[in-house]
């Protein structure tokens, strides 16, 4: 429950209030109204809902339908002149976050908050942290892959970082469930559209940075992308940063006055010895660790999570056990065919993560290697060039381009945009399942491998804005073992 008086106080304190408009009347105050729900979905309103009219695709007709359902008040940057009072603000997204925070009783104050950002590795690092903290704490987790608000029941996530109304509702539920910690992935988009506006994290972790999410509906430039990634550092009480990341000196300077730990090359916290399924660390986490996820980058993610959890009350024993227990759906999952050939399923979906995936596989598989790859439609358009240029560096790999969440674009046209930057041959098979079957049928020995990149554990394809039925890469591959 929240009163309109409190709503207006919050907006005015944030310098985000313009006025209240109803017909020809303009006001700066209002009294005697209470709201028992918040919503940005015009299909889920009641007379006591405070509704937020947001988004480029929002239409006046949505508001009119909500009024038919009894809506009596809304917040907007625009006066839609629909006959009910409108609280006009400068920034609707800022308003949503601060009002949701208040409506749910500031649940963040009752949780220790850990956030991961980076171009890749956020989900893996979040899972490491979850498994570490669950040894002696009660963590909830919001990840790109799955969400748990009670530490036991998992459900599929819709966004890397939820909309602020959903985020604070989830936090409140986690508190109600007795959780003590919350692990989150915080995307650059979350800061771009202010889903975490006003929120301070106890520990923020910056894993890495490389060009991604650059396009008409995301970030216009790499500089803008990097800036929004770095905002997590400004909004965290303590930070963990990868000393081996590109542009590290920029971040190092930014966090110099904060409580911080660095890990990786040139830092105290390094991996001194590394094998496929174990590694040895120096510094605060000094010791030997078993790990299920192969690849040096996964070992670095484990170190980042361990350092963060150490600051949040985990013991070294918790960290050892949690790292050893961690596996992640759709991340470096390995199947073995009857002929001994390996199938690697991974969520790698940008140039840098695909390169690391290929390099790890080539360390272990010396025979014929197939790569199944696509690029999503209507987002991350810079990936297409990145993929094309990257694949030129691996002429020994057989490449099959295919559909990967084409959305409202033609998968064949996306493949041609990738090919435009390639100086080598590749095949195109529209149907993703057929592409997987074809590649697996052409392997013949334990030295061979099929790499299926992009979708990980996603059991759908995004086509024309909807989630179309698809079994998922891992399940499809299992059918042809």
Curated annotation (Swiss-Prot):
Keyword terms of this UniProt record: ATP-binding, Cell cycle, Cell division, Cell shape, Cell wall biogenesis/degradation, Cytoplasm, Ligase, Nucleotide-binding, Peptidoglycan synthesis
Gene Ontology biological-process annotations: cell division; cell wall organization; peptidoglycan biosynthetic process; regulation of cell shape
Coiled-coil features, chain-numbered ranges: none
N6-carboxylysine: modified positions: 229
Enzyme class, UniProt record, top EC level: ligase
Top-level taxon in the UniProt lineage: Bacteria
SUPFAM superfamilies assigned to the protein according to its UniProt record, in alphabetical order: MurD-like peptide ligases, catalytic domain, MurD-like peptide ligases, peptide-binding domain, MurE/MurF N-terminal domain
Pathway as given in its UniProt record: Cell wall biogenesis; peptidoglycan biosynthesis
Keyword Cell division: yes
PTM (free text): Carboxylation is probably crucial for Mg(2+) binding and, consequently, for the gamma-phosphate positioning of ATP.
GO molecular function, a single term: magnesium ion binding
Positions with a binding annotation for UDP-N-acetyl-alpha-D-muramoyl-L-alanyl-D-glutamate: 42, 160-161, 187, 195
Motif L-lysine recognition motif per record, residues: 404-407
Catalytic activity, EC: 6.3.2.7
GO cellular component: cytoplasm
InterPro entries: Mur-like_cat_sf, Mur_ligase_C, Mur_ligase_C_dom_sf, Mur_ligase_cen, MurE/MurF_N, UDP-N-AcMur-Glu-dNH2Pim_ligase
Binding positions (ATP): 118-124
Reaction catalysis annotation: UDP-N-acetyl-alpha-D-muramoyl-L-alanyl-D-glutamate + L-lysine + ATP = UDP-N-acetyl-alpha-D-muramoyl-L-alanyl-gamma-D-glutamyl-L-lysine + ADP + phosphate + H(+)
Localization, UniProt: Cytoplasm
Family note: Belongs to the MurCDEF family. MurE subfamily.
Function: Catalyzes the addition of L-lysine to the nucleotide precursor UDP-N-acetylmuramoyl-L-alanyl-D-glutamate (UMAG) in the biosynthesis of bacterial cell-wall peptidoglycan.
Protein's UniProt name: UDP-N-acetylmuramoyl-L-alanyl-D-glutamate--L-lysine ligase
Species assigned in the record: Streptococcus suis (strain 05ZYH33)
Gene that this sequence comes from: murE
């Amino acid at each position: 429950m929240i009163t309109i008086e409190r709503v207006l106080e919050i907006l005015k304190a944030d310098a985000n209030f313009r006025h209240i408009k109803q017909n020809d009347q303009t006001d700066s105050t209002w009294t005697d109204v209470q709201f028992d729900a918040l919503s940005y979905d015009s299909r889920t309103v009641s007379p006591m809902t405070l509704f937020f009219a947001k988004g480029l695709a929002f239409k006046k007709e949505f508001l009119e339908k909500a009024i038919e359902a009894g809506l009596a008040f809304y917040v907007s940057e625009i006066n839609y002149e629909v006959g009910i009072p409108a609280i006009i603000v400068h920034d609707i997204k800022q308003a949503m976050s601060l009002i949701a925070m208040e409506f749910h009783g500031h649940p963040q104050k009752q949780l220790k908050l850990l956030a991961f950002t980076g171009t890749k590795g956020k989900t893996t690092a979040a899972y490491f942290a979850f498994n570490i903290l669950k040894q002696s704490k009660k963590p909830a987790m919001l990840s790109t892959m799955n969400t748990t608000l009670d530490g036991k029941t998992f459900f599929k996530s819709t966004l890397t970082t939820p909309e602020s109304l959903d985020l604070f509702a989830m936090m409140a539920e986690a508190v109600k469930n007795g959780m003590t910690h919350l692990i989150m992935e915080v995307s650059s988009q979350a800061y771009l559209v202010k889903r975490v506006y006003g929120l301070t994290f106890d520990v923020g972790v910056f894993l890495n940075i490389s060009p991604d999410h650059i396009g008409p509906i995301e970030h216009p430039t790499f500089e803008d992308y990097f800036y929004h990634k770095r905002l997590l550092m400004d909004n965290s009480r303590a930070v963990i940063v990868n000393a081996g990341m590109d542009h590290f000196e920029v971040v190092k300077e930014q966090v110099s006055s904060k409580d911080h730990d660095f890990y990786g090359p040139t830092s105290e916290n390094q991996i001194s010895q590394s094998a496929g399924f174990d590694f040895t660390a120096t510094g605060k986490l000094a010791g030997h660790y078993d790990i299920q996820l192969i690849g040096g980058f996964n070992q670095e993610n484990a170190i980042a999570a361990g350092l963060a959890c150490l600051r949040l009350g985990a013991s070294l024993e918790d960290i050892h056990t949690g790292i050893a227990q961690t596996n992640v759906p759709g991340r470096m999952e390995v199947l073995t065919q009857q002929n001994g050939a390996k199938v690697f399923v991974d969520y790698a979906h940008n140039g840098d993560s695909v390169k690391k995936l290929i390099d790890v596989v080539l360390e272990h598989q010396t025979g014929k290697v197939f790569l199944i790859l696509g690029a999503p439609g209507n987002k991350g358009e810079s990936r297409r060039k990145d993929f094309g240029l990257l694949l030129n560096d691996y002429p020994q790999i057989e490449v099959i381009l295919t559909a990967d969440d084409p959305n409202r674009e033609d998968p064949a046209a996306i493949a041609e945009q990738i090919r435009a930057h390639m100086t080598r041959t590749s095949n195109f098979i529209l149907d993703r399942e057929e592409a997987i079957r074809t590649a697996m049928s052409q392997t013949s020995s334990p030295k061979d491998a099929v790499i299926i990149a992009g979708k990980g554990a996603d059991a759908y394809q995004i086509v024309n804005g909807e989630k179309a039925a698809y079994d998922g890469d891992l399940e499809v591959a299992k059918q042809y073992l």
